[in-house]
């Protein structure tokens, strides 16, 4: 498993999803955050260490790694961030990771 290649594919999917959302809907003014959670057996496992190498960090929840910047959108719209995080998680899921998008309003 080449985690860097998977990350690059997922990040490209996230960027494309963010851009497509903005093109279709603009930037809704609902502020918030979105991220990707990946469930692992242990946060010091090989899988978790590989995820950490591409920017994931240990979550406050047990056996979970998360990534807060999935694409390259730097605005505040939660909807745009959710689109990117969802696309990123879908790519990881395709490669066998238990990945999900998380979000919360600001």
Question: Whereabouts are the PLM-identified features?
Answer:
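Short acidic, glycine/tyrosine-flanked loop/strand segments centered on an H-E-D-like triad
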Residues: 57-70
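N-terminal leader/targeting segments
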Residues: 1-57
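Short, compact, well-ordered microdomains
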Residues: 68-106
